[in-house]
Swiss-Prot record:
GO biological process: cell division; cell wall organization; peptidoglycan biosynthetic process; regulation of cell shape
Cofactor: FAD
UniProt protein name: UDP-N-acetylenolpyruvoylglucosamine reductase
Annotated Pfam families: FAD_binding_4, MurB_C
EC number: 1.3.1.98
Biological role: Cell wall formation.
Keywords: Cell cycle, Cell division, Cell shape, Cell wall biogenesis/degradation, Cytoplasm, FAD, Flavoprotein, NADP, Oxidoreductase, Peptidoglycan synthesis
CC terms in the record's Gene Ontology section: cytosol
Group of enzyme by EC: oxidoreductase
Pathway info: Cell wall biogenesis; peptidoglycan biosynthesis
Homology family: Belongs to the MurB family.
Domain FAD-binding PCMH-type: from-to ranges: 39-205
Residues annotated as catalytic: R185, S234 (proton donor), E304
Amino acid sequence: MNFQLIDGEALLAQLQPALGDIKGKLTPNVDMRKVTWFRTGGLAELFYQPADEADLALFLKTLPEFISVTIVGIGSNLLVRDGGIPGVVIRLSAKGFGQVQQVSPKRFLVGAATAGKHLAAAALEAEITGFHFYHGIPGGLGGALKMNAGANGIETAARVVEVYALDRKGRHHILSLADMHYSYRHCAIPKDFIFTAALLEGEPGNRDDIRAAMDEVALHRETVQPVREKTGGSTFRNPENISAWRVIDEAGCRGLQIGGAQMSEMHCNFMINTGQATGYDLEALGETVRARVFAHSAHLLQWEIQRIGQFEQSRIVPSFG
């Protein structure tokens, strides 16, 4: 595995002459521990927060193609490795991409940086049902669109009418629900696409019923998930016909710990940073759990948490299976 030296100051100096018209914020050597909910990870070589969609499109058109681009959202379902992220990390801000606009009696135009709880609150205010499950999803809409995030038996795919995206060259795309090719925690859109917004649809509802559904979602999270810990949410996707937490528990991995990383005692499909975990600790724990579960029940767990960046040179976690 090739290791690239992180030098954001040098990269910024190299790119700045060509990026003079960019309005967004470019910052070198950003500590990703301040960005992710796990509070782990190395440096982002260059961190870009576009002012708006036009600014993002111009940036992508201008950025040389040999510079790698990594997209991050709110950071709730993200593990950044300790060696950092070479190239440019792009994070959409709520200021430029956090709108929730009701465009018809049943539809919202929603920016990709909108937090799930804000979308649920807007739907409550508009008395549109079908969005209450977002009250229990800690991330933003961009990640929900990419992962077909869901809770309480509803997935994002059930709400999508159209998705708006930019590709690596800054070209605009309008994607239908069929174009997204959704399946469980997956869409088949090219990895270099950046979702900027989506048109979502619900149904007219009753405010009291919607509020009750949101309260039920919140109570469930508080009761069974370690929401007050430094965690990335669900670690692994559910295997077919069984919950990931069950096969993890049956393999004896509840409470399993490596360094500062632990499988939660409260919900053993949640990894937590107990205080001083590194990205290495978390990923090593996850791969250990995958190996033990496979040895116990032949279920090969697939990561739900997104792992990005490079390992430190001397601390590489081999992937099981």
